[in-house]
Amino acid sequence: MKIRVLKQAFLAFVAMAFAATSSLAATATDPVLAEVTTGEWRSADEKSRDAARKPIENLQFWGLKPGASILEVQPGAGWWTRILAPYAARTGGRYSATAADLANPSITEAARKGRADFAARFADEKIYGKVELVNWGATAAPLAANSYDFILLSRVIHGWMRVEGLLDRHFANLAGSLKPGGVLAIEQHRENPGPQDPMAESGYVTEAFVIEAAERTGLRLAARSEINANPKDTKDHPFGVWTLPPTRITVPYGSGKAPDPNFDRSKYDAIGESDRMTLRFVKAIP
């Protein structure tokens, strides 16, 4: 009896030890990723959003690896850029970002300036390595085929839905530019399941819509995560997702109106950043 009890206790100990080891392995952080997320080149404001945006958890879920060739699509002000470019530089990888199409004869001066400003902001090669900008837009030439290990789409898909045919064009372009086995990582404001507004006026898109669009190109949904879920997000805000932090608008988006000083923001600030889907697609290896 005593021997059986001791044996059971020993087996329980081994099981707990194995579980603890497995848990640690599953949550072990890439040391370079940890380093670049705390880099002094990231502002205090950018770092303050880490609790909501969870950069390390997301990038590890998506499967970012040292030495990867990375493409960030429509990087905006560069919140992800200040993590991805230094990571690529420190691991022997390559970082590229899409930018205004300089080959477009109709390019506006504002678009040209935006591209130049982005390039200047990330020109320090000691921090960011060599940042490559690639032409992108409705009429841009296709990206180089089989060029990237990792492509990030962060909260941009809703904008593509407002131009007929653009969504499918962009997804096909990105799928073609992925190397076999490469990852398309998606973070997008998430609408509740149901019919999709074809124009995505609120900024929210259903998971089913995004998955179908990506899979039309032959990409395979490898995993989805609730890392960026926010159950407090009711998704019925007066000015769409942009009512929430960090944009926090108080008048209709793009209206050109002055901010409304009497708009009560407290309810929306309490919600925090949007509820977002987190998806990982993989390109098949022939």
Features from the language model and the residues they span:
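Class I SAM-dependent methyltransferase Rossmann-like catalytic core
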Residues: 33-61, 65
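Helix-to-beta-strand junctions that scaffold the AdoMet/dcAdoMet cofactor pocket
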Residues: 89, 160-161, 178-180
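A short glycine-rich, Lys/Arg-flanked "PGG" loop and its adjoining helix->strand segment in the class I
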Residues: 167-180
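Conserved Class I S-adenosyl-L-methionine
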Residues: 197-224
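C-terminal lobe and adjacent flexible extensions of AdoMet/dcAdoMet transferase-like proteins
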Residues: 263-286
